[in-house]
């Protein structure tokens, strides 16, 4: 593992996490709907899609930029961006059933794990 690459992911991830913290905190909850969370998940998904769209359409994006922006910043901003990109890739590749399974598995698993963590924290 290259320490320079690890540093890029670390700095990008920290920056993304701080952005998530700030954006989630400044936006109000609207009728119990977490607007800030929706914003950061949507923003991270858009940014990751944009980055990999640039690569897909032929722009030479360096490995360092991909690590800092994609893995680091978008990962720190929201891990949801990776899930969204992977689902989009499955759809783009015509793997509709797998994409649907990916959506249900991720959404149901994460909701279940939030519930499980909540219940276990109570003990």
Swiss-Prot record:
Q: How is its activity regulated?
A: Na(+) is not transported, but it plays an essential structural role and its presence is essential for fluoride channel function.
Please give, as recorded in its UniProt entry, the membrane topology of this protein: Multi-pass membrane protein
Q: What is its main location?
A: membrane
Q: Which GO terms describe its molecular function?
A: fluoride channel activity; metal ion binding
- Provide the catalytic activity annotation: fluoride(in) = fluoride(out)
Q: What keyword terms does UniProt attach to this protein? A: Cell membrane, Ion channel, Ion transport, Membrane, Metal-binding, Sodium, Transmembrane, Transmembrane helix, Transport
A single GO CC term for this protein reads: plasma membrane
Which Pfam families would you find in this protein's record?
A: CRCB
Query: Matching InterPro entries, A to Z?
Result: FluC
UniProt entry tagged with the keyword Metal-binding: yes
- Where, subcellularly, is it found? Cell membrane
Q: Isomerase as a keyword?
A: no
Q: Which GO terms describe its biological process?
A: cellular detoxification of fluoride
**Main role?**
Fluoride-specific ion channel. Important for reducing fluoride concentration in the cell, thus reducing its toxicity.
Q: Which family does it belong to?
A: Belongs to the fluoride channel Fluc/FEX (TC 1.A.43) family.
Q: Which HAMAP family match?
A: FluC
Q: What is this protein called?
A: Fluoride-specific ion channel FluC
Which organism is the protein's source? Pyrococcus furiosus (strain ATCC 43587 / DSM 3638 / JCM 8422 / Vc1)
């Amino acid at each position: 593992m290259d320490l320079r690459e690890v540093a890029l992911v670390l700095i990008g991830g920290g920056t993304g996490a701080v952005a998530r913290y700030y954006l989630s905190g400044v936006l109000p909850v609207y009728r119990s709907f977490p607007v800030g969370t929706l914003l950061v998940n949507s923003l991270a998904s858009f940014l990751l899609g944009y980055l990999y769209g640039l690569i897909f359409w032929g722009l030479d994006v360096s490995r360092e930029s991909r690590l800092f922006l994609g893995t680091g910043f978008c990962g720190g901003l929201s891990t949801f961006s990776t899930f969204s990109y992977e689902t989009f890739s499955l759809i783009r590749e015509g793997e509709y059933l797998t994409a649907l399974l990916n959506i249900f598995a991720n959404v149901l698993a994460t909701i279940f794990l939030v519930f499980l963590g909540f219940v276990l924290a109570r003990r």
